[in-house]
Amino acid sequence: MLQQCCQLLEDRLLKVAFIESASSGYLTSQFSIHKNSGADILLGGLVSYDPRIKISVLKVDPKLIETYTAESPQVTEEMCRLGQTLFQQADIVVSC
């Protein structure tokens, strides 16, 4: 699956960035070491495992975390949206 994703991104000249929490940087790591593709497709990633990072770096509203939990779909969606401001050159931002 990783190889297919990397190949599709490379074929379409797309750049990806990751905003990770639960995966703790695993996706960024895997995409970065993919043979001959890492530098061509990966812009970077941010690991925001601790809610304080979500709040201070990504600027997630603390009330959203209080209402839904730091691992909720609502917070994850907001992380993705806010991650687009950090990685403006990314065609795709993935948050998990």
Residue map of PLM features:
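Short alpha-helical segments enriched in small residues
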Residues: 1-96
